[in-house]
């Protein structure tokens, strides 16, 4: 994962570049140049959501899977943590508890950063910050790109369980969260994105371009860039879960649930680091 304060449009330590999202946004909603931008503040735990994400008039339809994106120690604790780490951790814990109780599929995405990065494999910052509950319905998928589907077994895992509807949470909003959600949409999944369960960093000021962009504004822009297909809800607490139609039984032996070698999947935790 590349932090936005490391390289606005400059080569990053990982050798990748920040790029504009590819989500489809109606032309009529595109912004024109402005001399000033409205203030966006972080969302307090129990205050009203932004007008654009007003509470739905009817209960949300349940989802069959939860994708927890890069909730790794470096990004949610210590000096490198996103500003709203405490909120994201609280909401993610709630989502995990309800998903597990309902028998939904849970997938923890874990980013393998470049050597020397805060999330380089097998460093303290790389570790998943929240506990994984081993079993056939809970997996860890390691990745090397922002998109959790890129060169991983995530798509096959969802298909095997019959998942067609899922929720996404984690960090960073405009990078790995958005990239993973966008691909899920392109693959035909229904995607629910709880507004209070993802976060990112402030974007630092750039001479002759902009002042500092608050993290809350970056997160909101990331949601908007996903287009009309994504379902943005104000509260993670409003997301219900249900077991997917083809999910393995909870009592299935671990050996039967183990994936084939080379898929990058593990029901009990991260697999060995891939050869470099």
From Swiss-Prot:
One of its GO terms (biological process) is response to antibiotic. Does not require a metal cofactor. Its EC number is 3.5.2.19. The active site is at residue 176. It catalyses: streptothricin F + H2O = streptothricin F acid. Residues 252-267 have a biased composition (Low complexity). Homodimer. This is Streptothricin hydrolase. It comes from Streptomyces noursei (Streptomyces albulus). The gene is sttH.
């Amino acid at each position: 994962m590349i932090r936005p304060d490391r390289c606005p449009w400059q080569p990053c330590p990982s050798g990748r570049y920040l790029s504009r999202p590819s989500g489809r946004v109606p032309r009529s909603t595109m912004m024109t140049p402005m001399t000033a931008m409205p203030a966006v503040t972080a969302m307090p735990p129990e205050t009203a959501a932004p007008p654009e994400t007003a509470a739905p008039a009817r209960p949300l339809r349940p989802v069959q899977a939860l994708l927890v994106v890069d909730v790794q120690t470096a990004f949610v604790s210590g000096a490198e943590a996103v500003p709203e780490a405490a909120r994201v951790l609280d909401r993610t814990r709630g989502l995990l508890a309800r998903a597990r109780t309902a028998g939904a599929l849970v997938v923890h995405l874990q980013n393998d950063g470049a050597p020397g990065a805060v999330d380089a494999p097998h460093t303290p910052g790389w570790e998943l910050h929240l506990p994984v509950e081993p079993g056939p319905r809970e997996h860890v998928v390691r990745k090397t790109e922002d998109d959790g589907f890129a060169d991983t077994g995530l798509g096959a895992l969802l298909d095997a369980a019959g998942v067609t509807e899922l929720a996404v949470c984690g960090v960073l909003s405009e990078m790995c969260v958005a990239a993973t959600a966008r691909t899920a949409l392109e693959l035909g999944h229904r995607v629910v994105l709880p507004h209070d369960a993802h976060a990112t960093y402030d974007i630092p000021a750039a001479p002759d371009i902009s002042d500092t962009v608050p993290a809350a504004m970056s997160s909101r822009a990331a949601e908007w860039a996903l287009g009309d297909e994504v379902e943005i809800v104000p509260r993670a607490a409003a997301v219900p879960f249900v077991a997917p139609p083809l999910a393995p039984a909870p009592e299935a032996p671990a050996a039967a649930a183990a994936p084939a070698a080379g898929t990058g999947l593990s029901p009990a935790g991260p697999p060995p680091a891939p050869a470099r």
